[in-house]
């Protein structure tokens, strides 16, 4: 696993969309692997943080690989502001735009992304706030672990249906193997 992928400059998504999307997918896989490793070591909040970063990278990859379809749909709907937003920052799947992105991707045929994004935002809250009963969606460590495992599995399933290159396939197999140890 090339650890420098997550640390390197990404190409402009408008110039090299396929490369950008592939790098974000690889980043998603690397973060997912780290989430599993953190969970195995008992660091649930760190695992949650990595899982959320993985989800954002995966969503960015999906947006860029489906960018033309999203923009075409927005043009038909007359949503010029949405088009500008996707060109300016939406392609990167910012946290504040994840729900809208999930809806747009579901409109293209991706199933369950709104529900998963809602759950991932809960994981994000847990990563920052821990078991604070006034803020966190989880009130026990056990509940957080159950949710983390379910969401990791869901993300694995989503990645599994994508066409992957050899490096991505190898990393996904490694992820599945480590997940089975949880």
Go through each PLM region and give its residues.
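Long amphipathic alpha-helical segments with strong coiled-coil/leucine-zipper propensity
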Residues: 40, 50, 71-72
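Long, charged low-complexity segments
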Residues: 68-182
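Charged alpha-helical initiation segments
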Residues: 1-44
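Amphipathic alpha-helix face/heptad-repeat signature
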Residues: 24, 50-51, 116, 144
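Solenoid-repeat scaffolds in large eukaryotic assemblies
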Residues: 47-48, 54
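Short, charge-rich amphipathic alpha-helical segments embedded
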Residues: 55-73
């Amino acid at each position: 696993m090339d650890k420098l992928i997550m640390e390197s400059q990404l190409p402009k998504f408008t110039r090299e969309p396929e490369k950008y999307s592939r790098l974000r997918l690889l980043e998603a896989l690397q973060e997912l692997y780290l989430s599993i490793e953190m969970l195995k070591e008992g660091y649930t909040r760190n695992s949650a943080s990595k899982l959320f970063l993985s989800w954002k990278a995966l969503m960015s990859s999906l947006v860029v690989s489906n960018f033309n379809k999203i923009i075409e749909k927005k043009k038909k709907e007359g949503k010029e502001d949405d088009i500008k937003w996707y060109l300016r920052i939406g392609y990167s799947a910012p946290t504040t735009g994840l729900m809208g992105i999930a809806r747009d991707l579901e409109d293209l045929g991706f199933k369950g992304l709104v529900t998963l994004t809602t759950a991932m935002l809960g994981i994000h809250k847990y990563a920052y706030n821990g078991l604070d009963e006034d803020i966190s969606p989880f009130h026990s460590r056990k509940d957080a672990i159950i949710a983390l495992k379910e969401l990791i599995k869901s993300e694995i399933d989503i990645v599994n249906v994508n066409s992957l290159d050899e490096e991505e396939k190898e990393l996904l197999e490694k992820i599945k193997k480590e997940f089975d140890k949880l």
